[in-house]
Amino acid sequence: MLKAHFKKKLPTFELEADISLSNGILALVGPSGAGKTTILQCLAGLQTPSWGEINIHGKNVFSSQHGTDVPIRNRRIGYVFQDYALFPNMTVEKNVMYGKPKKGSVPNKVLTAANVLEMLKIEHLRNRYPNQISGGEKQRVALARALMTEPELLLLDEPLSALDQDTRSTLQQELLKLQAQWQIPFILVTHDPQEAEMLGDQIIKLDRGKQEGIRKLHRVQ
Amino acid sequence: MEFSYIPIILSLKVALAAVIIVACSSIPIAALMAKREFWGKDVVESIITLPLVLPPSVIGFMLLYVFGKNGPLGKLFELWFHTRIVFTLAGAVIAAAVVAFPLMYQAVKVAIENVDQNLEKAARTLGARELRVFFTITLPLALNGIVAGLVLAFARSLGEFGATLMIAGNIPGKTQTMPIAIYFANEAGDTGQASILVIIMTVFSFLVIYGLNRWGKGPRRDTRGGGA
């Protein structure tokens, strides 16, 4: 469950986000420079909002009023970067294992690299380096790496924009499946309205930092 | 006169010790300067780079002042270790380290700044603390620059003359490094000794520059995040 209402001053406009999401996929759609990535970064703790509150699963991770600002590493948020940000000095397996919680710290699920790699169909790549795999494969590795931390919220910044049409359609389907399996809220940034329609249970349109429309859809699974 | 290889050994000792000091000090300082903003940062940056542009005699003079018998650090050394710095090999090491520091610092700082910040951010979202981010992401990806800095610092230490002469003097077998031995052999008309040392230094310097150039053109590790 995510509840966030915050503002962030940017050089040319002020961004305002008001998001409430319990499960499913929220698609943030808008042109380049609308502030979509800034919203994700504020939620993750990579940027600090100028005002507002962010609550994840009832836990207050940011509050300008109370001076709360929980460090990124304690927010339990998975983040998939636009360019995947895979560590080039590590194999696929080491990338995926990088964020695995220490034993005992998260008792609810038993996650091993093997089953995350299998779920995303990348077991055969475990000993390769990021520069030896394709764009679609990189995307799966980035997803696996983020899920390995057992996040309570997954943020995806234009995860499919650099992929060809075929890979893109396949991965869209897989994202839907993954969300249904994982049962945590996903926020997905995209500049493609069609993709937003296809993936979003909820769509927020953003233009120059203002939320222009919120639509709740009931997707037929 | 018979050829003496002792200056070569002394030079190697000095350069090695100086490089160790420079490596240990420049990496944390460069990381701090690349990553943190603080008041007066430009002044600190200028002071760090100063030995690169100051004449060696000025550096030598300053070192004599600081490490001399009545200098603040000279006195401390005398008190703690019952030893002096001036006219010892330690003085030569300090002189070499001071002139080599900015070269290493610049190389490391640029290398750290060039590491894709998204990779460091990604590591943080994966639960890593700052030290882990630094040792598992930043440092390995800046390795090319660090190695280049080490080689340059070693070469510069080996070639240090002016400041070394002022603080360590010219004591054959004790502080007489290669560049100093060349100068005094030439002054004394011993061109044989001077020529051999000149050839060794030139060949070595050539190999360093050639090696760095070749390495720079070689297959570099991709420091970007595997983007398409």
Spans of model-derived segments:
Chain B
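Transmembrane-helix boundary motif in ABC transporter permease subunits
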Residues: A17-I48, F61, A111-E113, L119, ...
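Interhelical loop and adjacent transmembrane-helix boundary motif
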Residues: M1-I6, M166-F206, Y210
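Non-cytoplasmic
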Residues: G68-K69, I146-F184
